[in-house]
Amino acid sequence: SIIAVIPYFGWARQDRKDKPRVSIGAKLVADLLSVAGIDRLITMDLHADQIQGFFDIPVDHLYASTIFLPYVQSMNLENLVIASPDVGGSKRASSYAKYLDCPLVLCNKTRERANVVATMQIIGDVEGKDVIIVDDMVDTAGTITKAADIMKEAGARSVRAIASHCVMSGPASERVEKSQLEEMLFTDSIPYNNACAKVKQLTVADMFAEAIIRVMNNQSISDQYLI
């Protein structure tokens, strides 16, 4: 059998038609992988959970929260608040907040065009809090840096961010460096050129290795998950 291990499924944002006469890229790549002959896929933090349904083969969907949550707990932040940079990520952020037993804050944003955030409002209280923004990936860093700056203006004591995939394209490194973020934490699902001193990466190698061992031995991988 052939098992494909793809920590960052790069086509995951193309999970639906956003305008006429365009392909659904995630479904196309899923079909190409199946035709190429893979029997199973191991990946992490897909942009949308329903992408698992694009495949006609078993998909093992791992979660970066397995390594992020112990790291957050080790910080021992007194007034921790978990935040989502947009309403779409509220389910993910809510699961973090529930596990860590802390409040949840949401950001409501409107986009002027792709990768450009026009306005943003905070739903919840961040004054005097240590905020950690949770997202699945950071591309141009426009949303996450704007959220951090607005939360600082609203009285947050500190603002950090964690995201599974370090896309960090274009002006992202410069934006993070100039923002109010104290730390930007990623996994190493995508290599980073260390252009920004605020960026730190945690390895997911052990998590994937454990998943591969369990799959090969026909064991359950669900007890790896924390949330």
Features from the language model and the residues they span:
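PRPP-associated nucleotide enzymes
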Residues: S1-I227
